[in-house]
Amino acid sequence: INTAYTDNGTQSNLINDLFADLQTFLSKYLGWMIIILANGFLVFSIYLIFTKYKNIKLGGPSAIPKYSYTNWIAMLFSAGLGIGLLFYGVAEPIMHLSSYPGMVDGDISYNAGKAIGLANLHWGLHGWAIYSALGLCFAFATYNKNLPFRVSSLLGSKVANNKPLAVTIDIIAIVTTVFGVTTSLGLGTEQISAGLSHIISIQETFSNKMLIILVITLIGLLSVSLGLDSGIKKLSQINMVLAIVLLAFVFLFGPTVFIVNALVQNFGAYVNTLIESATWTEVYDSSSWQNSWTLFYYSWWFAWAPFVSLFIARISYGRSIKEFVIGVLFVPSLIVFLWMGIFGNAAIHQVINE
């Protein structure tokens, strides 16, 4: 976060040390709880698909969805996956190849599959399960129980109607969301700045980074000010089309046959090691990899959850519980799998052949 607001790599040691110590503390003493919570949300979300409540509609039996499947999926994709996926779709699998402590020397087949699997773990099912479970709770509380459209409504009508307590809870949720937004904004600014520097030789100065932040903020404000239908929906449609075009270009003009073969193998490797990877706490290892990657990602998803889940609930009126969970949990995760598989394997192919 701090990097985006500093010039020429100069950073505040005090702030860096504070956040590093906080992250280490959370990883050491609460890492197990974060992992259990993430897995718990996934199990709970899948369970909801098969319960007797699966056909309950958000908004009542006569509720009709406001948005088509295409627009709904486009807004889901744009809400939960931003600029980070563009960068980490290529960079993360490569970084795992060299940093993950469980890699086997000389076994590129295992290592590459593991690297892609870890990237899918960080961006796929578990994160979307958090959004799915909380988003469903928001939607049900608002549309079926007529509670206010706030985070505090998750705790029931007694809390929602207790104004001081409800306001306190909502403020905590806002602060949590701010941390999530600033993390994304900081990472995104760094990526855009580095990209502009590489393509058109614009220097990565503090003023240029602040200008990038200003432009991103203005685009966001414009989209929100135009409303859900005229702003966010259309921006999501444009975002989805551009993502599909970029994905198709890399697939068709990259190592296509290699990517297709790798996708099949990646699926098997991901399914085979999902439980092991999702419950690994690094307790017997001396490295800090888990702290820097999986726990960081899970915490990031949790930080974004109040904001994104409210938005998902807002656009999901009229969907059944089963429809909601499948759409929110599995469709974006499938997009992530294809994205990581195509971009990540294209990058790995380049590494192997160099």
Where does each model-flagged region fall?
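N-terminal alpha-helical transmembrane segments of multi-pass membrane transport
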Residues: 1-111, 225, 248, 252
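Helix-loop-helix module between adjacent transmembrane segments
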Residues: 1-2, 8, 42-47, 82-85, ...
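Extracellular/periplasmic helix-exit of transmembrane alpha-helices
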Residues: 6, 88-102, 250-273, 333, ...
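Membrane-water interface regions at transmembrane-helix termini and the short interhelical loops
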Residues: 18-27, 45-66, 114-122, 137-147, ...
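Alpha-helical transmembrane segments and their helix-start/interface "positive-inside/aromatic belt" motifs
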Residues: 30-36, 64-85, 124, 164-174, ...
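Hydrophobic alpha-helical transmembrane segments
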Residues: 31-39, 112-135, 209-215, 281-305
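Juxtamembrane inter-helical linkers in multi-pass membrane proteins
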Residues: 61-64, 101-110, 148-166, 264-285, ...
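Selective recognition of specific alpha-helical transmembrane segments in multi-pass small-molecule
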Residues: 75-84, 130-132, 173-182, 211-225, ...
